[in-house]
């Protein structure tokens, strides 16, 4: 059976899980917390991982199939269901959301999770193997500072990311304003899957839809709750939630 190397609550990993589950691909998920994932990911990638402005050569998800491996969420979606990439417009939107949306919804989520005492530990306890979750209790001060530095999780970074996410949310709302059910027309594509998965950190889908357990909204700060509620009410957030409801199937 194939193995999927993940950071379980990562929205890029959710994108890959969604596609694999939708296509009925059998796999066993190997879950790692940030930092704990580096060695297993490098080993699984077998030199195929790539570093860019938003990821490293040890980035997840990685799908391991015997002696072969596929690195990156879009490559895994394409492997699972090639027909989802049905036009150049779909290809362009997937690339745009990967590069211009995903890093910013991630930063917004980490701004609130790392800023709220006990929230990152709750995320680990709910999703990671017990040994890793226990080890995090000792490693969290160092790991938290490294995550903040690597992902530029600070107030100016958060505010920049809100501007970026708002802009893409407004683009999506405008695209859907003519009444079309999906971003490129009448058919669900990789663009819809990618947008919904990468928007998920700011709408927090429930565990019956998302492939990991995200923190309940009541544990967030007042600012965090207001941010999530604003994105849930936005037409783009409503569209993302509808994609989860209509198209996200469990394994």
Q: What is the role of each PLM region?
A:
Residues 4-11, 64-68, 93, 97, ...:
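Conserved aromatic-histidine-acidic binding/catalytic patches
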Residues 12, 60, 194-195, 240-243:
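Long, contiguous hydrophobic alpha-helical segments, chiefly transmembrane helices and signal peptides
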Residues 57-59, 147-149, 174, 219-221:
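Short acidic (Asp/Glu) and glycine-rich catalytic loops that position anionic groups and cofactors
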Residues 101-213:
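GST-like fold's C-terminal all-alpha helical module
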Residues 198-250:
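Short His-centered aromatic/hydrophobic patch
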């Amino acid at each position: 059976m194939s193995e999927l190397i993940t950071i379980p609550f990562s929205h890029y990993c959710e994108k890959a899980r969604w596609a694999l589950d939708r296509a009925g691909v059998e796999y066993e998920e190997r879950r790692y917390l940030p930092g704990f994932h580096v060695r297993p990911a490098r080993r699984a990638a077998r030199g195929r991982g790539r570093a860019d402005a938003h990821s490293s050569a040890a980035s997840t998800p990685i799908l391991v199939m015997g002696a072969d491996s596929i690195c990156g969420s879009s490559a895994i979606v394409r492997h699972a269901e090639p027909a989802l990439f049905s036009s150049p417009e779909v290809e362009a939107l997937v690339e745009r959301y990967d590069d211009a949306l995903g890093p910013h919804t991630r930063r917004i989520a980490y701004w609130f999770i790392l800023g709220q005492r006990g929230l990152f530990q709750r995320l680990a306890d709910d999703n990671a193997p017990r040994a890793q979750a226990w080890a995090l209790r000792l490693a969290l001060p160092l790991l938290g500072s490294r995550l903040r530095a690597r992902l530029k999780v600070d107030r100016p970074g958060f505010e920049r990311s809100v501007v970026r996410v708002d802009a893409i949310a407004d683009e999506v709302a405008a695209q859907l304003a003519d009444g079309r059910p999906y971003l490129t027309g009448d058919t669900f594509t990789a663009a819809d899957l990618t947008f919904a998965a990468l928007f998920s950190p700011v709408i927090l889908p429930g565990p019956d839809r998302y492939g990991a357990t995200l923190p309940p909204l009541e544990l967030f700060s007042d600012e965090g709750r207001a941010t999530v509620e604003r994105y849930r009410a936005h037409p783009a957030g409503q569209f993302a939630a509808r994609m989860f409801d209509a198209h996200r199937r469990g394994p």
